[in-house]
Regions:
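Alpha-helical substrate-recognition element adjacent to the catalytic core
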Residues: 51, 57-135
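Short, strongly hydrophobic alpha-helical membrane anchors
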Residues: 1-7
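C-terminal cap/substrate-recognition subdomain and adjoining C-terminal extension
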Residues: 114-200
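Non-catalytic pre-domain segments flanking phosphatase-related domains
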Residues: 10-11, 18-65
Length: 200
């Protein structure tokens, strides 16, 4: 009798443990899905090529920011280079970020903001339009950034990206990174230098 009761007790504990594991797994999966949830029309756009207005002052400099190969090495999604971006933002108070990364195609603007430190989220002001469906895709990333900048009435902008082939040769706006390294101290210095040149 005691043995039977012991077996039932052990069985109950195992069942309860299994239930807890299932619930935890479901919660983890749900958080991942929400993090990269599909959003075809981000808040900034009413269509794939239409842009909303933004209150940009004459001193505003836009920073078009890629993620993979920039904020982290390759596509490991750790955002390990975020402290380097923080250095830039602290020294460049009129610099505002527009996300040009392909992450903008699968996340809302609010979702993208939550990837950044709280102190700088208000400086994430939008995303670039997607021109991937256009037949002529030469220098497509540059054209997306340029379209956004022109719509905003801003001619001072910097781009950080690891895919230089998406930009015209000698593009003065581009600060290129190595896909395997991401941002470095040299990237920080180059961005700050370009920012200071715009304001002088």
């Amino acid at each position: 009798m005691a043995g039977a009761l012991f077996s039932l007790s052990v069985g109950g504990v195992m069942f309860a443990t299994a239930v807890v594991i299932i619930i935890f797994s479901a919660m983890l999966y749900d958080s991942i899905v929400k993090r990269r949830s599909k959003n075809i029309n981000p808040p900034e756009f009413t269509g794939s090529h239409q842009l909303a207005s933004c209150n940009c002052s004459g001193g505003t400099v836009l920073l078009y920011l890629d993620f993979d190969g920039v904020l982290h090495r390759r596509m490991n999604e750790t955002f390990e280079r975020m402290p380097l971006l923080e250095k830039i933002l602290k020294q460049c108070p009129e610099l505002h970020i527009v996300v040009s990364s392909s992450w903008r195609e699968t996340m809302t603007l609010e979702g993208l903001k939550y990837l950044f430190p709280v102190a700088f989220r208000h400086r994430i002001i939008g995303v670039t339009p997607s021109l991937q469906e256009v037949k002529d895709t030469e220098y497509v990333r540059y054209r997306e950034c340029l379209l956004h900048a022109r719509h905003m009435g801003v001619n001072k902008f910097i781009i950080i990206d690891d895919e230089s082939h998406r930009f015209p040769p000698g593009c003065e706006n581009l600060v290129s990174t190595n896909y395997s390294e991401g941002m470095t101290d040299q990237t920080v210095a180059s961005v700050i230098m370009k920012y200071c040149q715009y304001l002088t």
